[in-house]
Amino acid sequence: MPKILKFNEEARRALERGVDKVANAVKVTLGPKGRNVVIEKSWGSPTITNDGVSIAKEIELEDKFENLGAQLVKEVASKTNDVAGDGTTTATVLAQAMIKEGLKNVAAGANPILLKRGIDKAVEKAVEEIKKVSKKLSGREDIAHVAAISANSAEIGELIAEAMDKVGEDGVITVEDSKTLETYVEFTEGMQFDRGYISPYFVTDAEKMEVVLKEPFILITDRKLSAVKPLIPILEKVAQTGKPLLVIAEDVEGEVLTTLVLNKLKGTLQSCAVKAPGFGERRKAMLQDIAILTGGQVASEELGINLEDLTLEDLGRADLVRVKKDETIIIGGKGDPEAIKKRIAQIKAQIEETTSEYEKETLQERMAKLAGGVAVIKVGAATETELKEKKHRIEDALSATRAAVEEGIVPGGGVTLLRARKAVEKVIEELEGDEKIGAQIVYKALSAPIKQIAENAGYDGAVIIEKILSNDDPAYGFDALRGEYCNMFERGIIDPAKVTRSALQNAASIAGMLLTTEVLIVEKPEEKKETPSMPEEF
């Protein structure tokens, strides 16, 4: 396939045109008064969104050289989205500002390699400054503010705060379609797994067709139970306490199942048997999770624990167990809180190590069950288009909130980036030559997001920057929604530090790469041969 090449200034200008086309489409969405973008779909209804990465991903330019620039900006947005889940528009605006200023200097004769070094040094100092001003989340209110800013909706902020309140920082929160027009949070308390009672004879509530065991003992084993003899000692001990018994095993059949059912019907021992969740190695891990949550032991040959030797201390305990036809919920496990924390930390470490998305999801699910439950945000809307847009905003806001939990929060509205210029000033003083110019490029770019937020809201960015910098309070900024100057923390205009940091680092990375580009190579489009038209008359 023949190639076409572009060199030097001509190549860089083509890249810049591509960057500008994507950035100009994305930056209209920035801030509380940012607008939406409508994207045509080859099938189904069009997508309406104000999410930077969704817009960038849809843009494919006709000119192949310009398209290379567009793809690089997509990379900025995608990388920021992958790392922090939000801040994609900010990252795009920063990248455009750095590229514009950088290309001016390259055209004037600056050395691109030295410019890149200067950019990297300045960004390093700015990131240190961002980390310095970040504060830990102080409670539900902060979580609601972070989510509300990300989703541009106080209602969504409250929903996410409610969900996080219920499941904790490590809990799993999923987003699903609602069958109604309402958007609400559904919560599954305790540890739930998809296995129900083996026999309907165990049912205690015939109306709901479920088994309810109050303060039961829980026997956990990875074996198949069929012979009753090894179990008689422990069954007798449990019967003497008058408490019910839940049996979780690979399978329960034959004599054991008959014995449990008969004793339940006679009223000697209220019990229920369920199959162990999962398969293979995952089953072993989940049984161990249940054992730690309830303070019991897994009766397993691998661990050298025989059924005959089981004592009441080896059984798990819980406040309540509900078993339906195909699900079991253990509420209020009596396990040691320290052991549960250690288990959660262990699963967290596994999540960080794994590269498989499926593995990551199953580990997060296990962690959530140990941490206390799963929250589902059910999203309702009048039309399919609105539903898609709303779900997208909620997913973004969730990611932003998790990022805030990780690295804390900073004043929002572009203020933190603007004030990080103070740290860059010191770098500029220390550097010289083209490296100094590189640091100045970052200095100038750091004011781009706040300018864009102001312009999208109909204000003059330069005037607002001057007024903000006249006040030494690091949290002092401009509320573009109300058109007022205020303390950003007090007003709840906050961003996750991780989002702000990632946006800056990714923008600088791509800007540096683009400035040091000298040649562009693309495939030559094939010339379509014209097919002869049919004669008008036969």
Swiss-Prot record:
Q: Where does ATP bind?
A: T29, L30, G31, P32, D86, G87, T88, T89, T90, G413, D479, A480, L481, D495
Enzyme Commission number(s) of this protein: 5.6.1.7
Q: In its UniProt record, which GO terms are filed under biological process?
A: chaperone cofactor-dependent protein refolding; protein refolding; response to heat
Q: Which SUPFAM superfamilies match?
A: GroEL apical domain-like, GroEL equatorial domain-like, GroEL-intermediate domain like
Q: InterPro entries per the record? A: Chaperonin_Cpn60_CS, Cpn60/GroEL, Cpn60/GroEL/TCP-1, GroEL-like_apical_dom_sf, GROEL-like_equatorial_sf, TCP-1-like_intermed_sf
Which GO cellular component terms, listed alphabetically, does the Swiss-Prot or TrEMBL entry include? GroEL-GroES complex
Instruction: Show the catalytic activity.
Output: ATP + H2O + a folded polypeptide = ADP + phosphate + an unfolded polypeptide
What GO MF terms are annotated? Answer: ATP binding; ATP-dependent protein folding chaperone; isomerase activity; unfolded protein binding
From the record, what ranges are coiled-coil?
none
Keyword annotations for this protein, in alphabetical order, are:
ATP-binding, Chaperone, Cytoplasm, Isomerase, Nucleotide-binding
- State the oligomer form and interacting partners: Forms a cylinder of 14 subunits composed of two heptameric rings stacked back-to-back. Interacts with the co-chaperonin GroES.
Under HAMAP family, the record lists: CH60
* NCBIfam families reported for this sequence: GroEL, PRK00013.1, PRK12849.1, PRK12850.1, PRK12851.1
Q: What does the function comment of this entry state?
A: Together with its co-chaperonin GroES, plays an essential role in assisting protein folding. The GroEL-GroES system forms a nano-cage that allows encapsulation of the non-native substrate proteins and provides a physical environment optimized to promote and accelerate protein folding.
Family stated for the protein in its record: Belongs to the chaperonin (HSP60) family.
Report the protein name in the record.
Chaperonin GroEL
> Which species is the source of this protein?
Thermotoga maritima (strain ATCC 43589 / DSM 3109 / JCM 10099 / NBRC 100826 / MSB8)
Gene for this chain: groEL
